[in-house]
Amino acid sequence: MRLYRDEAVVVRQHKLGEADRIVTLLTRQHGLVRAVAKGVRRTRSRFGARLEPFSYIDVQLHPGRNLDTVTQVHTVESFAADIIDDYGRYTTACAILETAERLAGEERAPAPKLHALTASALRAIAAKQRPHELVLDAYLLRAMRFAGWAPALDECAKCATPGPHRAFHVAAGGAVCVHCRPPGAATPAPGVLDHLVALARGEWAGIEAVPESTRKQASGLVAAHLQWHLERQLRTLPLIERSGPARDAATAGHAG
């Protein structure tokens, strides 16, 4: 079979035998790819450091029956140094990679939009110009849109009546009007849903001035909505600090 080349975000890796690793890549053209990187754990490996998570690489692979094999790799951008030196940025970036892997779907199913979004999110976290938790929430909202799970924010999830609305219910699909509001719906504080709309649209002007309590409650709703659709909790999200109001809102939205 012919070699192929692609650009990829390194999502994760784990040991294989004494000297090899299996790397999980989110590629631009081929979606999620798992490949063996032979000998990378040896001191003299040609490209071991280039296959660390948070790297953006140009990689050449040889197709295999179950796993491909990395034959060449060049670093395009390395975000790791500017991410791992801060716990908040590190856990946020880990949550982005875990989400990307979960949303990418079947292996080799092209996901160019998710690939580009993931690379952009890591780049933004490494740049340190915006709060990492806001980058994460914007990423999750847009990634869910690509998956077809975007929460309704400025119209009722049930009847499509234009908002603004005051209630949010995860199982209903997001914001709900007074007529469609199911039992157990959360009532976010004023400004929370507007904040989520701005994040989803990438309207960054003024976002950082939003009160911390509003931002944290919005984060809780985003996390609850994502994990309800995934039908399981992401391992990395609990490592990112959430305030009491965010957890309360997420729990209420999940009920019923």
UniProtKB/Swiss-Prot annotation:
It comes from the Bacteria. Keywords: DNA damage, DNA recombination, DNA repair. The keyword DNA repair applies. InterPro entries: ARFGAP/RecO, DNA_rep/recomb_RecO_N, NA-bd_OB-fold, RecO, RecO_C. The keyword Ligase does not apply. One of its GO terms (cellular component) is bacterial nucleoid. GO terms for biological process: DNA recombination; double-strand break repair. Involved in DNA repair and RecF pathway recombination. Belongs to the RecO family. This is DNA repair protein RecO. The lineage of its organism: Bacteria, Bacillati, Actinomycetota, Actinomycetes, Mycobacteriales. The gene is recO.
